[in-house]
Amino acid sequence: MKNIIVTGTSRGIGLELALQLAAKGHHVLAISRSIPQALLGNENISCLSVDLAHESDLQKVGDYLSSTWKQVDAIIHNAGSLLLKPFSETSQTDFESIYKVNVFGVANLTRIALPYLQKGSHVVTISSMGGIQGSLKFPGLAAYSSSKGAVITLSELLAEEYKEQGIAFNVLALGAVQTEMLAEAFPGYQAPISAAEMAKYIVDFTLTGNQYYNGKVLEVSSSNP
């Protein structure tokens, strides 16, 4: 059974990821700002309250890994922060708040986990179709979509930098999934796929995708958005 870190586990896809991985017998370190009741009491899930926007808060993860796991088989960078605001009203502070979670949080957590990653480990970053060059873009998502483009490039670079160690880095760029975040970005829109359905795909990819992919971006979308 594998040791897997999942971020953004308080709701939506992240919550489903933690539950589905645990149901398969894997050990999950569930990271979110608030800890949901649904994850408490599960013997395969350990929860940490961590704000990815604050680098110092991530020391909790480092402490846990050094004292408990000693090895990380996979990371799913699922946590995300969204801002829906016209570009003309989007300040540098707004951009920074989004990037602190969506980009810096990914980079900092990966760096902390690096000593525990090994040959065969798989780091999966959940991006968005909005971060794909040439994809359909939507007004008001400048900070969010550009941050999702940034982590795509980051993952490609890390795949190259750590290929000799046998650590795989891949990105899943998701289309519309019925989550609270989608409702915030596109009020009233009904997505064709549920959080549980998408989580199942991500779980399968995390466990097996590194056998076939490294440094790749897979577009997981059947609709626009």
Cite the ranges covered by each PLM segment.
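N-terminal Rossmann NAD(P)H-binding glycine-rich loop of SDR-like oxidoreductase domains
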Residues: S10, A18
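The beta1-alpha1 cofactor-binding region of Rossmann-like NAD(H)/NADP(H)-dependent oxidoreductases
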Residues: S49-K60, Q92
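Conserved NAD(P)H cofactor-binding loop of Rossmann-fold oxidoreductase domains
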Residues: N78-L83
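Substrate-binding pocket helix/loop in short-chain dehydrogenase/reductase
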Residues: P86-F87, D94-E96
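Catalytic loop of short-chain dehydrogenase/reductase
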Residues: H122-A150, S155-E156, E160-K163
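Conserved Rossmann-fold SDR core element
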Residues: I152, E161-V177, Y212-L218
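C-terminal helical subdomain
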Residues: V171, P187-P225
